[in-house]
């Protein structure tokens, strides 16, 4: 049996991030990559298997699971409420922090999925909409943890979901300043921000307040060597491996799907070919809709796609309107540090090429 996103051989990434977490907090880390490249799986594996629970307290806030359209939504996701008496107990017995919060923790991972807060304090945060009060409270929690000899880690998954929220300006910029305070200024708490939205990461990359205060870490799809080892582990022969690599590259989620289909007795090549037909149909539907709405942009998108007829990736000078459209539709991916534009997956690359061939004929 194979898990929906089985963890496999990320030793380079694990070693790097574990080393980062062993240092004194000094920088915000933005962990990004193509969709379904395994970012969340990697981080959870590190937390659950590589960190000493006696040394670290991890707060993992997953915004992916929530609809967030206003400040109140974000605050309610950020915090878990408890009775005041429990919070007082928490302050007294912080060393038993993890054991005292059974409802708030994934037993296997010992990850806290929200910041503990008394109900009346949460109500105050919601009514006043004062982010400074929220940040002061969070700082106090992290300071208390640090005083007890533990290192707090704050992880926010899919941070881009609050990118456009406003409270006297964009909330995201207030958060960035808070993260700088936690890391660069106070060296209090590690901050890891995960995102599959490369346009959001590009926006962050060009944000002046973060210069020299953050680092970007790319978690990409598997290379051929890792892909081959992964499929070999699941009894794929060399021909099947080459077929899967041709259609899917090293996209972890597609490799898992191929393994599951093989276990179900399906033909691997037929599954791959069907996957390409489906993805091509999806892209054509998006393009037809764009052509109806904006003929000029459609033509620029097709011209952009033509760059991939003989190349897997290209360099870009600036983020144009056609790049924005393709990235928002999860067709292309922007590697901001290297200025590289490439399809989100090998399947997208093949679909683009087949569509271009059909347009020519």
UniProtKB/Swiss-Prot annotation:
The keyword ATP-binding applies. GO terms for molecular function: ATP binding; ATP hydrolysis activity. Gene3D superfamilies: P-loop containing nucleotide triphosphate hydrolases, Winged helix-like DNA-binding domain superfamily/Winged helix DNA-binding domain. It holds the Pfam family ATPase_2. ATP binds at residues 33-40. It comes from the Archaea. Keywords: ATP-binding, Nucleotide-binding. Belongs to the archaeal ATPase family. This is Uncharacterized ATP-binding protein MJ1659.
């Amino acid at each position: 049996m194979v898990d929906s996103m089985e963890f496999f051989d990320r030793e380079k990434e694990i070693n790097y991030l574990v080393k980062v977490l062993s240092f004194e907090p000094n920088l915000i880390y933005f962990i990004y990559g193509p969709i379904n490249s395994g970012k969340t799986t990697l981080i959870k594996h590190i937390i659950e298997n590589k960190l000493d629970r006696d040394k670290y307290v991890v707060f993992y806030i997953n915004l992916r699971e929530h609809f967030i359209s206003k400040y109140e939504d974000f605050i309610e996701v950020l915090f878990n409420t408890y009775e005041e008496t429990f919070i007082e107990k928490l302050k007294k017995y912080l060393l038993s922090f993890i054991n005292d919060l059974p409802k708030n923790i994934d037993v296997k991972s010992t990850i806290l999925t929200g910041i503990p807060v008394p109900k009346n304090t949460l109500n105050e945060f919601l009514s006043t909409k004062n982010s400074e009060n929220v940040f002061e409270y969070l700082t106090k929690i992290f300071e208390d943890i640090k005083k007890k000899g533990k290192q707090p880690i704050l992880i926010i998954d899919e941070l881009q979901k609050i990118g456009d929220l406003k409270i006297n300006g964009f909330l995201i910029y207030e958060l960035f300043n808070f993260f700088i305070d936690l890391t660069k200024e106070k060296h209090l708490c590690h901050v890891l921000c995960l995102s599959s939205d490369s346009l959001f990461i590009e926006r962050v990359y060009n944000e002046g307040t973060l210069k020299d205060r953050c680092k970007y870490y790319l978690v990409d799809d598997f290379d051929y060597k890792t892909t081959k080892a992964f499929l070999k582990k699941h009894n794929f022969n060399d021909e099947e491996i080459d077929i899967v690599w041709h259609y899917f590259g090293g996209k972890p989620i597609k490799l898992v799907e191929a393994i599951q289909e093989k276990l179900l007795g399906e033909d691997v090549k037929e599954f791959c070919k069907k996957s390409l037909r489906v993805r091509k149909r999806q892209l054509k539907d998006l393009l037809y809709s764009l052509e109806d709405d904006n003929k000029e942009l459609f033509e620029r998108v097709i011209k952009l796609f033509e760059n991939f007829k003989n190349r897997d990736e290209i360099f870009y000078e600036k983020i144009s309107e056609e790049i924005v459209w393709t990235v928002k539709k999860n067709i292309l991916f922007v590697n901001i540090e290297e200025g590289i534009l490439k399809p989100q997956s090998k399947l997208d690359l093949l679909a683009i090429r087949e569509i271009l061939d059909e347009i020519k004929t």
